[in-house]
């Protein structure tokens, strides 16, 4: 398929022939070769073992009898140096069973994939692993030639990998020989002209000789400049590549992703650079027959997304100048092959800002997959987490190996961060950061191995911004005595919230009942920058208030304040039982214990529903000095608080609002009367509430 039209050769006085970009992971080609499937079948089958059933323990023994109770899954090691780290990237993937199955199918069938999930769950790792297991295509080089019919539309040719360099070298050698011949003829003519001028018997013969030599030199120098354009440019060089390419176009501008044509400041006077030499390949051309990975796909501008759609649909894309002010905007090559597998990634908001047609292309020619945040806690998975620690140590290269107790503490932290019973977190990037901080501490302390104490210290030093903010907030509350100094208060309840997903904070809620301002009905006024979900939770609480109260609520206004909620406001429904308790306390004038905090969602029938982040909320209550905390019964097994807090706080699981009031309110005669009245109205006895359990429902994100 090579273009052998080399009728003219360029002169050798233009040494600045631009070199093509070849120091990237480029694999480009034009045509599918069915013969490749025979050699590639075995490699695609390797995807069956994509991070699953890997011998993470190498030659180390496993105590199967104690595997269930051991945080190492029965692994018997002296330190992480005993654990064999797989050489292949695919074998280092942990969890994400559904995503691995999708990746396997996409690699076999050449399908696009969109991965949506939280940061640090392995999206880029899976994409890179997929590229290394793609079938080996017949790699090709891409050449760009001058178009004699239209210099602004360079021709594109493909040749087998390695042939591109040979063709360019052959063109350059021919140009060099032709240049030598032109130089030889030029000097012969200059000598003849000078000799003839000197033979003429006139006073001006020296000047005539000089002018003759200069004229001949300029004639040879600036004529036949078109021969320069006959040397093609090697746009993509795959001479040394043996595997499919992986191109990361995350955050790339239009020129870097789609290809570009450089601006030529000298466009006339014989100084112009041929248009084909100014063509530069983009990520989509370099990713031909490989994987194009784009993280945060929604951050691409609409114009780039539209052109990406065209490339996906057609499998080829012309390169043109991306800046309308550049001379390259007038150049447009023939179509360059870009038959890639696109792996798009992003968080949940990616789908909102993503071009609908681009998402439709991916769905029409591929798969969508949601990345898991957690995975079931099993002995085998714990052993893989131990291998993960060994991988991080080997990858960093400057960390001391981890002792077994340090690995156990890291696995325990993975359980805590999961926020669910019998689960481990799959946000391994954050966990890897903790591994590196612990290793740095161990090295600074002069430890041969990273110990459990180093991991505990790392947890303190590697706190998130939200955790540091919460600690400062608690200290400010103490400094300015923002917390109540009494043991009980009417209409005031200590609620609990989560910031940033891994930091709990105590958020007091106050309620007050006043005569209605409107003559038609009583209203609920909630302040604290409540968001939509929190506002709906307040409305649901009002149903319970109206149901049990003897008061005519149409004649009263209910004021609810989330004290010092901050600029971020309040979202989620986990403060439902807090709001209900505060309003009931204010309405009935019954005080609430102030050494108590609570969290939980609430149904309109009074059932307490599960919420998220319960571990972080309990720890926040303990830090704030609370002695007791109320949580939903359904979250009881999700609690994974640190050892230092277990003796500081009592955890009280509940299933119904009547249980909440029985624990939170003080003043026996008034409280008992209120609770009994609530039981009779709701038809739910306190004694039978624990047997009936919860009514279900999904955990709140807050």
Curated annotation (Swiss-Prot):
CDD domains: AAA (cd00009). It is a multi-pass membrane protein. GO terms for cellular component: plasma membrane. Residues 1-183, 224-702 are cytoplasmic. Residues 10-48 have a biased composition (Acidic residues). Residues 1-63 are annotated as: Disordered. The chain crosses the membrane at residues 184-201, 207-223. The active site is at residues 574, 617. PROSITE patterns: LON_PROTEOLYTIC (PS51786), LON_SER (PS01046). The keyword Membrane applies. This is Archaeal Lon protease. The keyword Transcription does not apply. ATP binds at residues 117-124. Residues 487-667 form the Lon proteolytic domain. NCBIfam families: lon_rel.
């Amino acid at each position: 398929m090579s273009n052998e039209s080399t009728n003219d050769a360029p002169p050798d006085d233009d040494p600045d022939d631009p070199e093509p970009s070849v120091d990237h992971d480029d694999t480009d080609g034009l045509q599918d070769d069915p013969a490749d499937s025979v050699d590639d079948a075995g490699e695609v089958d390797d995807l069956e073992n994509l991070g699953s059933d890997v011998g993470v323990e190498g030659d180390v023994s496993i105590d199967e009898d104690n595997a269930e109770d051991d945080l190492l899954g029965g692994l018997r090691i002296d330190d992480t140096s005993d654990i064999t780290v797989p050489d292949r990237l695919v074998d280092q993937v942990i969890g994400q069973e559904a995503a691995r199955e999708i990746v396997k199918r996409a690699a076999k069938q050449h399908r696009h994939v969109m991965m949506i999930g939280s940061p640090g769950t392995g999206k880029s790792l899976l994409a890179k692993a997929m590229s290394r297991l793609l079938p080996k295509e017949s790699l090709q080089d891409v050449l760009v030639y001058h178009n004699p019919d239209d210099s602004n539309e360079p021709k594109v040719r493909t040749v087998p990998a390695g042939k591109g360099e040979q063709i360019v070298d052959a063109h350059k050698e021919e140009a060099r020989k032709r240049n030598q011949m032109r130089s030889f003829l030029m000097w012969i003519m200059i000598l003849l002209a000078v000799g003839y001028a000197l033979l003429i018997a006139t006073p001006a013969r020296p000047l005539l000789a000089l002018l003759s030599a200069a004229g001949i030199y300029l004639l040879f120098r600036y004529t036949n400049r078109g021969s320069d354009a006959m040397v093609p440019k090697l746009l993509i060089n795959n001479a040394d590549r043996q595997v499919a390419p992986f191109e990361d176009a995350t955050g790339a501008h239009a020129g870097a992703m789609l290809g570009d044509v450089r601006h030529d400041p000298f466009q006339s006077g014989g100084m112009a650079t041929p248009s084909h030499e100014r063509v530069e390949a983009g990520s989509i051309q370099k990713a031909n027959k490989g994987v194009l990975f784009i993280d945060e796909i929604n951050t691409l501008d609409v114009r780039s997304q539209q052109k990406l759609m065209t490339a996906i649909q057609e499998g080829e894309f012309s390169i043109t100048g991306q800046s309308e002010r550049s001379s390259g905007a007038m150049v447009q090559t023939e179509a360059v092959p870009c038959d890639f597998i696109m792996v798009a990634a992003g968080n949940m908001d990616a789908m909102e800002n993503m071009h609908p047609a681009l998402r439709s292309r991916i769905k029409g020619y591929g798969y969508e997959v949601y990345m898991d945040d957690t995975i079931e806690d099993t002995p085998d998975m714990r052993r893989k987490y131990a291998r993960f620690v060994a991988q991080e140590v080997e990858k960093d290269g400057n960390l001391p190996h981890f002792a077994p107790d340090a690995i156990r503490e890291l696995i325990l932290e993975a359980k805590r961060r999961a926020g669910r019973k019998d689960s481990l977190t799959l946000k391994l990037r954050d966990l890897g950061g903790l591994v590196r901080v612990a290793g740095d501490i161990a090295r600074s302390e002069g430890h041969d191995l990273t110990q459990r104490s180093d991991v505990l210290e790392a947890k303190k030093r590697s706190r998130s911004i939200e955790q540091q903010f919460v600690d400062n907030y608690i200290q400010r509350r103490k400094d300015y005595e923002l917390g109540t100094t009494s043991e009980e208060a009417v209409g005031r309840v200590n609620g609990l919230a989560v910031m940033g997903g891994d930091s709990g904070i105590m958020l007091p809620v106050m309620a007050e009942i006043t005569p209605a301002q409107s003559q038609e009905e009583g209203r609920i006024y909630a302040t604290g920058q409540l968001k939509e979900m929190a506002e709906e939770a307040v409305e649901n609480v009002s149903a319970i208030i109206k149901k049990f109260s003897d008061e005519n609520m149409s004649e009263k206004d209910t004021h609810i304040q989330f004290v010092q909620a901050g600029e971020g406001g309040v979202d989620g429904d986990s403060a439902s039982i807090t709001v209900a308790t505060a309003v009931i306390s204010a309405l009935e004038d019954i005080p609430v214990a102030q050494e108590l905090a609570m969290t939980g969602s609430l149904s309109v029938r009074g059932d307490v529903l599960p919420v998220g982040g319960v571990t972080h909320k309990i720890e926040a209550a303990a830090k704030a000095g609370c002695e007791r905390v109320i949580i939903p019964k359904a979250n009881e097994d999700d609690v994974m608080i640190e050892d230092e807090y277990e003796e500081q706080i009592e955890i009280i699981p509940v299933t119904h609002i009547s249980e909440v009031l029985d624990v939170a309110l003080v003043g026996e005669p008034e409280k008992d009367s209120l609770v009994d009245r609530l039981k009779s109205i709701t038809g739910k006895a306190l004694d039978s509430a624990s047997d009936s359990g919860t009514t279900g429902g999904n955990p709140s994100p807050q």
